[in-house]
Amino acid sequence: MNQQRYAAYRSLVTELNEWKFARALQPETHEELCDAAEGLLLARGGDEAEEPLARASTTVLGMLALDELDEQNASWLLDAMLSCGPRMPQALEHAA
């Protein structure tokens, strides 16, 4: 973890809390995304970050499928998640 990743994590959690309080995010989904963000924050390398990133991606894709999230916010959310974790060049290649 470093200061930049911690700041990204705090910013993401603040935004997720706002979405939850605005009822734009279900409590279970909020918990899943916050847990994944914390897992990414605490990951020391790409291998440790794969599982929380996969959970976050699955959650975001599910929200897109149910029209609970638009593509712009989904893209922002995944970018914000990636910012919480260690550099993962292979994740960026697959996301493009």
Enumerate the predicted regions with their spans.
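Intrinsically disordered, low-complexity linker/tail regions enriched in Pro/Ser/Thr
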Residues: 1-21, 96
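Amphipathic alpha-helical binding modules
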Residues: 9, 57-96
